[in-house]
C-alpha cells in the first residue's frame, strides 16, 4: 500500500516580498483542461488543502491557514480535503466528513487535531471517534448516524478519487482550481506555501479578466 511522504517544513521568519514563482520549481501544473479551472458554483476560484489529522505539519499549518483565510477575497472557495492511504486514514476521513455534518464543524475540527497531537489520541477506532465527539458536545445518535451514512461514504469515495486526480503524494498540499498543485517539497515553508498560493490565485484572476 502506498505510503505517504511527510515533508519536513523549515521554519522561516523572513518572507520574500513579491517573489516570482516558477512552474515546475515552486508549483506544478497537474491539469490543463480549461473547463476545470474555475469552480462552477458562483464562478469562484477553488482552493483545496489536502491533509491528514495525523500529520504534524498539517497540524501546525492549520494556524497559518486560519489567518490566511481571513484575508481572502470573496471570489475564493476554500475546501479541506482529507487524504486516504490506509484504513486508519480512512477512519479519520470518515470522522472529518461526519464533523462536517454537525453544527460547529470548525470547532470540532480544531479540537480533533489538538487531541491527536497534544493529547496523543490517535483515534484508531470508530468508537474512539464517536466517544470523543460526544465528549465535546455532539449528540451520540447523530454522530453514529452520520458516520455510517451513504453521504459520508460518498464524500470519502470522492476524496479518494481526487487523491489520484490531483496526484497527491504528500501532505499538506494545496490544489488551486483543479489545475495547480503546491507540495511541501516545493514550498519548503508554511509561509511560502501560502505566498505561492496567492501568486497562483492572482494568475487565475488575471486569466479570467482577459
Language model regions located:
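Sec-dependent signal peptide recognition
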Residues: 1-7
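Extracytoplasmic thiol/disulfide redox context detector
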Residues: 7, 11-90, 160, 164-170, ...
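Solvent-exposed loop/turn segments at secondary-structure junctions
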Residues: 54-57, 84-88, 114-119, 151-152, ...
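Short phosphate-engaging motifs
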Residues: 57, 104, 139
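Alpha-helix N-cap/helix-start motif
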Residues: 58, 88-89, 122, 186, ...
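Extracytoplasmic/secreted envelope proteins and their assembly/folding machinery
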Residues: 62-69, 92-96, 109, 126, ...
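Structural microenvironment flanking redox-active thiols in thiol-disulfide oxidoreductases
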Residues: 71-101, 106-134
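C-terminal cap of thioredoxin/glutaredoxin-like
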Residues: 135-210
Amino acid at each position: 500500500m502506498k505510503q505517504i511522504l511527510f515533508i519536513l517544513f523549515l521554519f522561516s521568519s523572513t518572507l520574500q516580498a513579491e517573489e516570482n514563482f516558477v512552474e515546475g520549481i515552486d508549483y506544478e501544473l497537474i491539469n490543463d483542461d480549461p473547463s476545470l479551472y474555475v469552480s462552477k458554483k458562483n464562478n469562484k476560484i477553488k482552493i483545496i488543502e489536502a491533509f491528514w489529522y495525523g500529520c504534524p505539519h498539517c497540524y501546525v499549518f492549520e494556524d497559518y491557514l486560519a489567518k490566511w483565510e481571513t484575508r481572502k477575497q470573496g471570489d475564493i472557495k476554500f475546501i479541506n480535503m482529507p487524504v486516504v492511504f490506509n484504513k486508519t486514514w480512512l477512519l479519520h476521513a470518515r470522522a472529518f466528513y461526519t464533523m462536517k455534518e454537525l453544527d460547529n464543524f470548525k470547532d470540532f475540527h480544531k479540537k480533533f487535531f489538538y487531541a491527536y497531537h497534544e493529547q496523543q489520541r490517535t483515534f484508531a477506532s470508530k468508537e474512539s471517534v464517536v466517544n470523543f465527539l460526544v465528549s465535546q458536545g455532539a449528540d451520540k445518535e447523530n454522530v453514529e448516524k452520520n458516520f455510517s451514512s451513504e453521504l459520508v461514504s460518498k464524500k470519502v469515495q470522492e476524496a479518494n478519487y481526487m487523491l489520484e486526480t490531483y496526484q497527491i503524494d504528500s501532505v499538506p498540499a494545496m490544489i488551486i482550481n483543479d489545475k495547480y498543485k503546491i507540495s511541501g517539497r516545493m514550498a519548503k515553508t508554511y509561509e511560502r506555501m501560502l505566498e505561492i498560493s496567492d501568486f497562483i490565485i492572482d494568475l487565475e484572476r488575471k486569466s479570467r479578466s482577459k
